[in-house]
C-alpha cells in the first residue's frame, strides 16, 4: 500500500511507545473510532436515500392528484377498492409512475455525469449541506403542492439531494477503511426498507400523504448531524483499510499503480488516466446498469399494471406493498457482504433480466394466479439488486489503487443511475401502450 501503509504503521508504533503503561487504551480508542465511522456511514446511507425512496413510494399518490383536489385528502386505510379505468383492464393513472421515476433520477444522472470532471474541486462540507437542504425542501414542496407539476419539482429536489450525496459519500469512503462501504450500502438498503415501510405504515394508519411527508423532516437533520458530529477525521486511518492478504490479492484496474499512490490525489489525474481507469471499470459498470435497468423497469413500468382486483388491497395499497417488499430485499442483500461476496456480478444481471421477462409476460398474458406469487418475485428482485450494488462497489474498492480509488468510486456511481434512467424512458411509452389495450 506504499507510503500510506507505512505512515499507518509508524503511527501505531509511536502510539505503542507512548502508552506502554496502558497498552489497551489505543486499541480501545481505535475500536471506538472504527465503530463511530461505521455507524456514521450507515446513517449517512440511510438518510441520503430516504427522500428518494419515499418519493417513489408516493408516486401513485402524487399522480392521483390529477383526479383529486390536491394531496391533502385523507387516505382511506380500509379495503375499499378504488374506481377502475373502464377503458382498460388496467387501473391506470393518466401518467405512468415512470414520470416520477424520471424526475427522481435524471437530475442525479446529470450530477453523476459531471462529478468526475470537477465536483472534487468543491469541499465535502458544502456538498453535504446542499444535499441536506434539498432533501428537506423536497418533503416540504411535495407535501404542500396542489399540482402534479409542482410535486415533480419537489421530486427533483430529492433527486439532487440523493445524487449529490451518493457521489460525495462514496468518494469519501476512499479515505476510510474499506469496511465502511458495506456499512454505507447497508444504510442505503435500510433507507429503502424504512422509507417505503414508514410511508406504507403511516398512510395505512390513516395519515394523509401531506402529514406523512412532513413527519420525515427529521431525516435531513440526522444526515447533517451524522456527517458533522459523528464521523471522525480520516487522517489517522489507513484509507484502504485492507489487511496484507487483501492488498496482495488486489488486481489493479490499470497497470500504472505506483507504490507511493494514495487516496486524495484524484484531482491530479490526467484525462488520459481517468479514461484508462474508466475503461477498466466497465467490467463492473455494465452488469450494474443492466441490473438496475431491469429492476426499475419492473418497479416503475410494471408495478402499477400488476393489479389484482380480487384482493382486499386497493390499487394504491398494492403499489405500496410492492415497493416495501422490493426495498426489504434490497436491504437484506446490501447488508450481506460479510456473509456472501459475489465477484461475477454479470450473473445477477442475467437473473434480473429473467425477472423482467417473467413479469412483463404476466402483465400481457395475466397467467400468475395470486398476488402472493408477485410478492415473492418482487422480494427476490430486491435481493438481486441489492447484491449487485454492494458487491460492485466492494470489488471496485479492492481492485483499484489508492491513487485512483476516489475517482473510480465517483465514476462507477453512474451505473445504477444510467440503468434507472433508461428504464424510465422506455417505461413511459409502454405504460401508454398497455393502458390503451381493451
Swiss-Prot record:
Motif window: Lysosomal targeting motif: 242-244, 409-419
Membrane topology: Multi-pass membrane protein
Glycosites: 71, 85, 310
Keywords: Cytoplasmic vesicle, Endosome, Glycoprotein, Golgi apparatus, Lipoprotein, Lysosome, Membrane, Methylation, Phosphoprotein, Prenylation, Synapse, Synaptosome, Transmembrane, Transmembrane helix, Transport
Regions annotated as coiled coil: none
Chain positions covered by the region annotation Disordered: 1-27, 67-87, 239-261
Changes seen on gene knockout: Embryos are viable and fertile and by 12 months of age do not exhibit obvious clinical signs but have significantly shortened life spans. Mice show elevation of lysosomal enzymes in brain and accumulation of autofluorescent storage material in neurons, retina and other cell types that increases with age. They also show neuropathological abnormalities with loss of certain cortical interneurons and hypertrophy of many interneuron populations in the hippocampus.
One Pfam family in the UniProt entry: CLN3
Compartment annotation: Lysosome membrane; Late endosome; Lysosome; Membrane raft
Tissue expression from the record: Expressed throughout the brain, such as, in the cerebral cortex, hippocampus, cerebellum and several different cerebral nuclei (at protein level). In the cerebral cortex, expressed in all cortical layers. In the hippocampus, expressed in the granule cells in the dentate gyrus and the pyramidal cells of the hippocampus proper. In the cerebellum expressed in the granular and molecular layers, and in the Purkinje cell layer.
Highest taxon of source: Eukaryota
Main location: membrane
Modified residues (Phosphoserine): 14
A GO term for molecular function: calcium-dependent protein binding
Subunit field text: Homooligomer. Interacts with DCTN1, KIF3A, RAB7A and RILP. Interacts with CLN5. Interacts with KCNIP3.
Family classification: Belongs to the battenin family.
Function: Mediates microtubule-dependent, anterograde transport connecting the Golgi network, endosomes, autophagosomes, lysosomes and plasma membrane, and participates in several cellular processes such as regulation of lysosomal pH, lysosome protein degradation, receptor-mediated endocytosis, autophagy, transport of proteins and lipids from the TGN, apoptosis and synaptic transmission.
Name by which UniProt lists this protein: Battenin
